[in-house]
A protein has these predicted regions:
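Short amphipathic alpha-helices in soluble, non-transmembrane regions
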Residues: 30-32, 93-97
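Core segments of cupin and vicinal oxygen chelate
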Residues: 17-62
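Vicinal oxygen chelate
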Residues: 2-24, 58, 69-94, 96-133, ...
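Short secondary-structure boundary/capping segments
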Residues: 8, 55-56, 71-72, 104-105
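Short acidic/glycine-enriched loop/turn segments that link adjacent beta-strands
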Residues: 49-53, 74-76, 107-111
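N-terminal beta-strand motif that seeds the catalytic metal site of vicinal oxygen chelate
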Residues: 1-31, 78-80, 133
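A short linear hydrophobic-aromatic micro-motif
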Residues: 42-44, 65, 100-103
């Protein structure tokens, strides 16, 4: 029994899945953004899932899966939040390569930035170490 009296408990998040449009061009854009810019290596999808398209990126416990949606529409509100070391440098690199970053309304004590992935999905970026912390 858990501390709240339930026989079950959600322990953690295994991965985040974002949608993407179909096609090899989209996969190349995803790899350029998630591996090239964010530094999360692409990993092979299990063979039984590979025919669905999309791509997976993993580093340590961070897992981001991009799944193909034929009728793709980007997630404008729902989003993952990535903890980033060297956030200022990343934002500079993103801006230089045509991915505008925007400062979010701060939650007290937690500065946040947003960027859209190549498909328009919102991604939140927060620093590893908060200023003064």
């Amino acid at each position: 029994m858990t501390e709240n009296g339930h026989l079950h408990s959600v322990e953690s998040i295994d991965h985040v899945q974002l949608a993407m449009p179909p096609g090899p061009e989209a996969e190349a854009l995803a790899e350029s953004f998630f591996s090239g810019l964010l530094g999360v290596p692409r990993v092979p999808k299990p063979p039984e899932l590979a025919s669905r398209g999309g791509c997976w990126f993993e580093r340590g416990r961070l897992k981001v899966h991009l799944g193909v949606e034929e009728d793709f529409r980007p997630a404008r509100k729902a989003h993952p939040a990535f903890v980033v070391s060297g956030l200022d440098d990343l934002c500079t690199a993103l801006e230089r390569l045509g991915y505008p970053t925007r400062r979010a309304e701060d939650v007290p004590g937690s500065p946040q930035w947003y960027v859209d992935d190549p498909f328009g999905n919102r991604i939140e970026l927060i620093p590893t170490r908060l200023p003064g912390g």
